Amino acid sequence: MTVLKEQPPRLLRGIPLASSGLRKTFGQREVLKGIELHIPAGQFVAIVGRSGCGKSTLLRLLAGLDQPTAGQLLAGAAPLEQAREETRLMFQDARLLPWKKVIDNVGLGLSGDWRPRALEALESVGLADRANEWPAALSGGQKQRVALARALIHQPRLLLLDEPLGALDALTRIEMQQLIERLWRQHGFTVLLVTHDVSEAVAVADRVILIEDGEVGLDLTVDLARPRARGSHRLAALESEVLNRVLSAPGAAPEPDPVAPLPTQLRWAH
């Protein structure tokens, strides 16, 4: 299997992220309460927590789909807004256009001679042979691979993942976790993964951040060699530590549903 052609070093480095005093309110409800984060370039971070804790709101702020009520979001020393072109977002729904073939979904919005690049991106996710098929012919896991290829073709420095594997069966989910990890190690982008699956968070991330009622309740380094042996004692111990903390946190009301942005406002791997 070939991989995407080597890019200049600038494109292979992740974006360092920082938030300072980050707050978000919806009406009278404060969903994020002064979040302070420092994420080195190229780190793989998983964000976990109960439903309604604020983790999805945090990801929306990082993606530029919503604006903070107070505080700062930085890419290095610059406002995060300046890194929007180098940021891509994947959702649980692959959001493929059903009237466009797979390769055209990957190259959506591109101009010039983009088809060779789209084929390279598809090959990097193992789907070059499905380039000229319709999305309806693909399984759920294959559709997410296409969405990932659509992100990779832009050589992102920041990849935001909002429960992208939540609808997949267990085996396909593990395969996608391994694929995302391999591509992250190859390209060096910064990854933030929002997930309800604690085992997934511990298996793939360098660091697991637990959001509790809008605040950072736990910031755990996963200091395990890669590739990680699933079922190992150390992995199970870390998973248990995070899960016990999640279960001890009180539940919260669901996060408010924001107004859906127009398709042209999204940088969801297109």
Swiss-Prot record:
SUPFAM superfamilies: P-loop containing nucleoside triphosphate hydrolases (SSF52540). It is a peripheral membrane protein. The keyword Nucleotide-binding applies. Residues 17-238 form the ABC transporter domain. GO terms for cellular component: plasma membrane. Signal peptide: none annotated. Keywords: ATP-binding, Cell inner membrane, Cell membrane, Membrane, Nucleotide-binding, Translocase, Transport. Belongs to the ABC transporter superfamily. Aliphatic sulfonates importer (TC 3.A.1.17.2) family. This is Aliphatic sulfonates import ATP-binding protein SsuB. It comes from Pseudomonas putida (Arthrobacter siderocapsulatus).
